[in-house]
């Protein structure tokens, strides 16, 4: 199950919004963990927490978006109790203006979401809200490839949804054979982390799919999953947040995470 939570936060006076403040928020979250939970999360290959900051909806405000997977579910009660959040990078505490918890999301709910993908769609648009990157042979990849995107989603699914893993390597290869990046609008963007700058990218890519029906169903499942899991590295620290919408010519049909 996935627990999707959003907190509207009021920034201290004269404090500017920065996406990398999400790293400090994750630090505040870790500070409240029990030693047992902290050890459990750090032992995971992929941290079962994905979070990022989104600006607005009003000046001086931002929205903290979190997705908690089963191993981190107990954090929901901690987050719900917060009224202020102290961050070392801010001159005063952030005020919690609103807390919203959405209905838990199961595998079956993701399958149903994938089945609502519009048949008239010609592609899927990935909008990278926060800097995204991949680690390849010890270096950061400054541009996404189809293989890197699919491998990231595949690995995250298997780590975060262990009761319904994708074990067929041939299926991954077949999926990749029918996908291609058909358009992109990206720019370089660093993410500040522990005094370092992680090179990445933001913007959008459009991915077209020509797949047999079973593979198309799998692709749509991964599209439904991606906004909750994130893509690339350090998604628990605020990187790799993505929104996905169908590309439908001469139409404004919306298919977004709720």
What do the PLM-derived regions correspond to, one by one?
Residues 1-258:
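RNA-interacting cores
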């Amino acid at each position: 199950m996935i627990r999707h939570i959003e907190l509207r936060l009021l920034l201290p006076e004269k404090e500017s919004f920065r996406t990398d403040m999400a790293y400090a928020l994750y630090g505040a979250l870790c500070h409240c963990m029990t030693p047992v939970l902290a050890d459990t999360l750090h032992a995971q290959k992929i941290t079962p927490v994905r979070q990022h900051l989104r600006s607005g909806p009003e000046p001086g405000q931002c929205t903290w978006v979190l997705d908690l997977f089963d191993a981190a579910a107990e954090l929901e009660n901690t987050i719900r109790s917060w009224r202020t959040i102290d961050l070392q990078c801010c001159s005063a505490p952030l005020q919690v203006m609103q807390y919203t918890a959405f209905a838990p999301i199961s595998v079956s709910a993701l399958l149903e979401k994938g089945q609502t993908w519009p048949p008239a769609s010609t592609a899927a648009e990935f909008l990278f809200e926060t800097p995204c990157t991949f680690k390849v042979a010890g270096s950061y990849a400054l541009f996404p490839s189809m293989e890197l995107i699919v491998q990231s989603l595949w690995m995250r699914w298997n780590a975060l949804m262990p009761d319904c893993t994708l074990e067929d390597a041939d299926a991954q290869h077949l999926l990749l054979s029918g996908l291609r990046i058909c358009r992109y609008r990206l720019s370089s963007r660093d993410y500040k982390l522990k005094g370092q700058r992680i090179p990445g990218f933001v913007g959008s890519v459009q991915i077209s799919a020509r797949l047999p029906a079973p593979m198309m169903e799998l692709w749509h499942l991964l599209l439904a999953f991606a906004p909750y899991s994130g893509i690339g590295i350090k998604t628990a620290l605020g990187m790799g947040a993505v929104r996905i919408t169908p590309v439908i010519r001469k139409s404004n049909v919306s298919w977004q995470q709720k």
